[in-house]
Regions:
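Histidine-centered nuclease catalytic patch
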Residues: 75-128
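The −1 position to Zn-ligating cysteines in a subset of zinc-ribbon hairpins
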Residues: 69, 83, 132
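Short, structured coil/loop segments at alpha-helix boundaries
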Residues: 50-51, 108-112, 133
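Histidine (H) residue identity feature
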Residues: 32, 60, 74, 85-87, ...
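Generic detector of ordered, mature protein regions
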Residues: 53, 57, 95-102, 142, ...
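A detector for short metal-coordination/catalytic motifs
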Residues: 122-128, 132-199
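A boundary/linker detector
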Residues: 1-69, 74-78, 167-199
Length: 199
């Protein structure tokens, strides 16, 4: 096969051939379907979670800053597995907002552009997170745990100020309901947290 039929538009980061009507661009500014959009978001999410930078960020939170106990049970990493949970926004929501912003402004992007910007938000502390016991983290994602907003670390307000306009109504409702949860109206207390409640 001849390689000289493959050409490149270096400025646009695009491959093409005079022999074929189709070209291939590194960056996109549209999706052909909702499933393609969600697949792209999930790919970004997986790439971020697998990255060295994400692991360094997580380890810095837990090992260096010593934020290494469950905010609910106060059990520490010496006793149990502790997760860092993105809370306002979720990682999926954060990625969606960045993609939606780019789509709305007709800015071309690729997976790596989105992942880099998300990691920059992590390193600027411009997102919310809490440390949770692994089983509490599962409980939250199963809809069985409320997290009071005063437990959240990081500048989650930055996200709301700068990216909420790029979210759909369902995402906004979810975030608003989470923002409204405090210690006086959540479904548990320190002496009666969900792990001890019969379900």
């Amino acid at each position: 096969m001849e390689t000289d039929i493959i050409k490149s538009n270096v400025e646009n980061l695009e491959l093409y051939s005079d022999n074929y009507p189709f070209s291939l661009s590194l960056k996109i500014n549209t999706f052909h379907s909702e499933s393609e959009y969600k697949k792209f978001v999930r790919n970004c999410e997986a790439s971020i979670r697998r990255s060295i930078e994400y692991k360094l960020w997580r380890n810095y939170i837990i090992d260096v800053l010593q934020i290494n106990e469950c905010v609910i049970t106060h059990e520490s990493i010496d006793e149990v597995s502790i997760d860092v949970h993105h809370h306002i926004p979720s990682l999926f929501t954060m990625i969606s907002a960045l993609i939606n912003r780019n789509l709305e402004n007709n800015v071309k992007f690729c997976t790596f552009d989105i992942c880099q910007e998300i990691m920059e938000l992590h390193f600027k502390n411009k997102l919310g997170y809490v440390t949770l016991l692994k089983s509490m983290h599962e409980k939250f994602h199963n809809g069985r745990l409320d997290i009071p907003i005063n437990f959240v670390k990081g500048d989650y307000r930055y996200f709301m100020t700068n990216f909420s306009k790029y979210l759909d109504d369902q995402d906004l409702e979810t975030i608003e309901s989470r923002l409204a949860i405090n210690q006086s109206n959540c479904s548990w207390s320190r002496d009666n947290y969900p792990a001890a409640i019969g379900e």
